[in-house]
């Protein structure tokens, strides 16, 4: 697969990063526009379709949805094998390697999940006075 077209939901962005794929971004609403900024302007691994505003369900607002030409332009840009396209793919591949390294045994995400589990287990083993009280004692 050469690239992935995404609405820029957080899980899709993480999956693309982990797979080392460049993205064509087409956000619809909420945090997806912020995620698009991360993908396109910070990580430099995506090409925007050019959506200007949030979609309203049931309303086909002119200028909000991407046109065929917008999608075609973005796909052509992300699949370009010139200098910019090659650099984008190299950055995506590098991020993918870093993401995979983070989740292997001993990686940063592996360690952080282990620490979270340890913290939850420690908190669960300590006695919480609020849990021991009856509802009538809490007034």
Q: What residue ranges belong to the model's regions?
A:
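Catalytic core of nucleotide-sugar-dependent glycosyltransferases
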Residues: 1-139
């Amino acid at each position: 697969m050469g690239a992935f077209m995404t609405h820029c939901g957080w899980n899709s962005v993480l999956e693309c990063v982990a797979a080392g794929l460049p993205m064509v971004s087409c956000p619809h609403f909420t945090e997806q526009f912020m995620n698009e900024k991360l993908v396109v302007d910070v990580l430099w691994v995506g090409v925007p379709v050019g959506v200007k505003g949030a979609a309203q369900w049931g309303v086909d607002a002119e200028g909000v949805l991407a046109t065929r030409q917008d999608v075609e332009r973005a796909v052509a840009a992300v699949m370009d094998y010139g200098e910019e396209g090659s650099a984008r793919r190299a950055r995506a591949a590098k991020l993918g390697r870093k993401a995979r390294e983070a989740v292997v045994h001993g990686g940063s995400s592996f360690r952080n999940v282990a620490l979270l589990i340890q913290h939850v287990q420690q908190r669960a083993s300590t006695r919480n006075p609020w849990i021991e009280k009856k509802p009538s004692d809490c007034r």
